[in-house]
């Protein structure tokens, strides 16, 4: 596993019951690390690439089958998560607010549960 992604997930301080949203999940490596810390919580991971989502879902098949994870193909600005709320929303090396910053900010703010936090990582934490 990537030490950089381990450091990212450590910085998230994932709790067993957390509801976590990853934006731009790529191959699902960080998703695996998050799911290993969940017990009753759930990860929703999105990426605009169907190939990346397929790879991430394969990598995390046991977590998907256990109901700890779901993987969705979607652009951030088009993502419809209904009334779901998240304790932690994170992205690694993804520019969340460059295409339609106002819409992206509005969506992320709506998805955050009271007391929830947004994490953006471009370099290893530390």
Please report, for each region that a protein language model flagged, where it lies by residue.
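Nucleotide donor/acceptor-binding cores
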Residues: 18, 41, 87
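Conserved SAM-binding loop and adjacent beta-strand
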Residues: 1-9
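Conserved beta-strand signature within the Rossmann-like core of class I S-adenosyl-L-methionine
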Residues: 115-123
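A short acidic, Gly/Pro-enriched loop at the edge of an enzyme's catalytic core
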Residues: 77-89
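Glycine-rich helix-loop-beta junction characteristic of Rossmann-like nucleotide cofactor-binding loops
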Residues: 10-15, 36
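A short glycine-rich, Lys/Arg-flanked "PGG" loop and its adjoining helix->strand segment in the class I
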Residues: 102-114
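A short SAM/SAH-binding and catalytic strip from SAM-dependent methyltransferases
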Residues: 88-101
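Class I SAM-dependent methyltransferase SAM/SAH-binding core
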Residues: 21-79
């Amino acid at each position: 596993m990537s030490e950089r992604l381990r450091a990212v997930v450590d910085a998230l301080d994932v709790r067993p019951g957390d509801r976590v949203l990853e934006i731009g999940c790529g191959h699902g490596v960080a998703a695996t690390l998050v799911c290993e810390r969940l017990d009753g919580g759930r990860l929703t991971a999105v990426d605009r690439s169907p190939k990346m989502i397929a790879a991430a879902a394969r990598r995390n098949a046991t977590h998907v089958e256990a109901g700890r994870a779901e993987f969705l193909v979607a652009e951030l600005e088009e993502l419809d998560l209904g009334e779901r709320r998240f304790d932690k929303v994170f992205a690694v090396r993804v520019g969340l607010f460059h295409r339609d910053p106002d819409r992206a900010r509005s969506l992320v703010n709506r998805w955050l549960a009271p007391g929830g936090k947004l994490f953006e990582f471009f370099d290893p934490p530390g």
